[in-house]
């Protein structure tokens, strides 16, 4: 569960932009090479388990979080009704009986 404000912080998808003037993947701007696999050649998108961008642990259950920039795992965020990135209350779970099984 992610709130509307944190939804903008989520990463971009590895797909090319639409071909228009000023796009970052055109060959004229030097942004994209022909026949380049962006998933393999992008250094900032590559997973580095021992680097400084490793995944955090959940503040509630101490398990690893599978989304960069999040402080809570999806199970705890769903169970508590909070945003997994900032912890803001998204859903009122007072009368719900929720499980994260």
UniProtKB/Swiss-Prot annotation:
Q: According to the UniProt entry, where is the signal peptide? A: none
Q: Where in the cell is it found?
A: Cytoplasm
Q: Which GO terms describe its biological process?
A: cytoplasmic microtubule organization; mRNA processing; RNA splicing
Keyword Cytoplasm set for record? yes
Please report a single Pfam family linked to this protein. Cript
Write out the GO cellular component annotations: cytoplasm; dendrite; spliceosomal complex
Q: Keywords, A to Z?
A: Cytoplasm, mRNA processing, mRNA splicing, Spliceosome
Q: Which cysteines are joined by disulfide bonds?
A: none
The UniProt similarity line reads: Belongs to the CRIPT family.
Say what the protein does.
Answer: As a component of the minor spliceosome, involved in the splicing of U12-type introns in pre-mRNAs.
What's the name of the protein? Cysteine-rich PDZ-binding protein
Native organism is Gallus gallus
The organism's taxonomic lineage, starting at the top: Eukaryota, Metazoa, Chordata, Craniata, Vertebrata
